[in-house]
Amino acid sequence: FLWCFQRFFVYSASGRQRFNVLGALNAMTREVVTITNNSYINALSVCDLLHALAAKHTGEVVTLFLDNARYQKCGLVQALAEQLKIELIYLPAYSPNLNLIERLWRHVKQQVLYSRYYDSFPKFQTAIMDCINGTQSDNRESLRTLFSLKFQIIEKSQILNT
């Protein structure tokens, strides 16, 4: 136990409001395209992201690396990706280290959530979006190492040879 003569109150967020961000990170330019909502991420959210990517990169080849979430592998998403000429590549299961957007989410949590208090939900949302939108300008040096494209390639593995 720790005793003190004066009480110290720590502010914390009240309520259970939800703010979801679904994003795609350009590995070369560090540009982020996001879709946000206040409900749940589902196949329609992924379709919105595909439309946003297609609109932003008209006439360009777009390859999107995804994890194996069920809503990202459904027929609706795959059909739309084919229609928009977006190549979908699914990463191996349980490999968030290969997904660069997971590194961005970790960075956002560290910058926005750790030891921070927001007295209103809109301020919380703004802080998250400002951090995400700052990936091209703020903290470029620390983000350069965070988004490194140096992945270990394993040529021969006992697991792959069995």
Predicted regions and their residues:
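Short functional hotspots at interaction and active-site rims
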Residues: 1-162
